[in-house]
């Protein structure tokens, strides 16, 4: 899969002042659960990031998106308001709100008409997976970060992320890093 920037999928910039010819991302997220998924969506929708040619990548050790698969028990409900989704508090008009998910899946009316106003954990998991599919250009699955090392170059602080991937070890460089690896 190609490296992605906000707005479309193109390779990150290479800089001649780098320690290596590898691309430098403006942001790399470690883990791709709800926290970094929400950040990815916010950056994807950011006009400022788009104007700056902001380059980002998210690294997830699992081979595909999954939110607490062992806790998706029949009848288990989400414990928070669905308004605390990936985007509503930041931008209620976002295409990535829970209610837009229900609308695009043809289930909004059914959800509104049911007695229970809190989604099931299975429904919430489906929403998160739907959003993750929309952000697929920014994610590298089966990439486990094994080390993060700050490096200096020409007075600029960068972070070298060492990754274990199915094809072997790989280094990546970023100006900023978010770590949201979830519970064990």
Predicted regions and their residues:
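Alpha-helix termini
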Residues: 17-18, 44-53, 153-154, 167
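A structural motif corresponding to the C-terminal end of an alpha-helix
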Residues: 131-140
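A short, basic/flexible loop-to-alpha-helix module at the beginning of a structural domain
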Residues: 6-24, 48
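Short hydrophobic core segments
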Residues: 28-30, 145, 161, 170-184
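A conserved short coil-to-beta-strand element within the FAD-binding core of flavoproteins
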Residues: 141-159
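N-terminal Rossmann-like FAD-binding beta1-loop-alpha1 element of flavoenzymes
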Residues: 22-57
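Glycine-rich active-site loop/strand segments that organize a redox cofactor
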Residues: 6-14, 55, 59-125
